[in-house]
């Protein structure tokens, strides 16, 4: 079977425009044959150092798609962004765009963001969500998150619900987020892409932190899909409703791929 690949298509970008109506609320999206309801998404965040682009752009995309987007951290505290991406000299090279910064200002004032779920609470589960997204980031706290036993346990329960043969849930990762999936499912045939060596080296030249090891080395070779050397590309797994991206430049394409996966899972 050939590897399913999602490639970039033309778009007017309207999904990423700022809200024009301050009273806008999510539109219920229903499962086929069932009463309409609002779909729920969970964005998993480190306590500090999350990547602004990898978090804010998907948040706006899926809120505009009609999802109720919630957040979760390991301790239940409000997550703090990687400030290098918002201000300072390094932000000129590796920082977020002005559009993303505008989204950040809006997202960081929402009730959902200011009241994240506590993943350490043993009653917390991902099973209540239709879509779970684990973004990455260059801050050391991101690596602590994706390697945490608690996140591994939560994902181990959730991933089987994403099986294409019988599942109705969707999973997504970006960059370092893929490490969490592979740690949670070492015995499952689930594959990921993540930041390739050449991209990671380039980011360090422009001021990103130097990690203890390159991200792709955390993923078993048999489960790692490097992908082509194109600007925008994401990988969609063959056996699970799971899509992964390599770096912040893949965010918009990942969102589009996830929209398609959610539609497939609901049917």
Curated annotation (Swiss-Prot):
It holds the Pfam family ThiJ_like. One of its GO terms (cellular component) is fungal-type vacuole membrane. InterPro entries: Class_I_gatase-like, ThiJ-like. It comes from the Eukaryota. Gene3D superfamilies: 3.40.50.880. GO terms for molecular function: catalytic activity. To S.pombe SpAC18G6.12c. This is Uncharacterized protein C14C4.04. It comes from Schizosaccharomyces pombe (strain 972 / ATCC 24843) (Fission yeast).
């Amino acid at each position: 079977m050939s590897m399913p690949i999602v490639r970039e298509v033309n778009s007017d970008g309207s999904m990423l425009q700022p809200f024009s109506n301050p009273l806008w609320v999510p539109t219920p999206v229903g499962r086929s044959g069932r009463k309409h309801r609002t779909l729920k998404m969970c964005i998993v965040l480190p306590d500090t150092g999350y990547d602004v682009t990898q978090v804010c752009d998907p948040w706006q995309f899926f809120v505009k798609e009609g999802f109720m987007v919630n957040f979760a951290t390991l301790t239940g505290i409000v997550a703090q962004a990687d400030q290098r991406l918002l201000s300072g000299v390094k932000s000129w090279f590796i920082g977020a765009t002005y559009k993303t910064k505008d989204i950040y200002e809006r997202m960081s004032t929402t009730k959902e963001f200011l009241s994240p779920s506590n993943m350490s609470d043993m009653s917390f589960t991902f099973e209540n969500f239709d879509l779970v997204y684990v973004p990455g980031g260059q801050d050391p706290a991101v690596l602590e998150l994706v390697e945490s036993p608690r996140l591994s346990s939560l994902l181990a329960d959730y991933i089987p619900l994403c099986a294409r043969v019988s599942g109705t849930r969707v999973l997504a990762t970006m960059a370092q987020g893929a490490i969490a999936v592979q740690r949670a499912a070492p015995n499952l045939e689930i594959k990921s892409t993540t930041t390739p060596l050449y991209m990671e080296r380039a980011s360090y030249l422009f001021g990103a932190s130097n990690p203890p090891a390159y991200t792709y080395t955390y993923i078993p070779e048999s489960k790692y899909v490097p992908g082509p050397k194109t600007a925008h590309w994401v990988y969609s797994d063959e056996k699970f409703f799971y899509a992964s991206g390599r770096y912040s430049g893949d965010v918009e394409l990942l969102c589009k791929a996830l929209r398609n996966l959610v539609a497939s899972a609901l049917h």
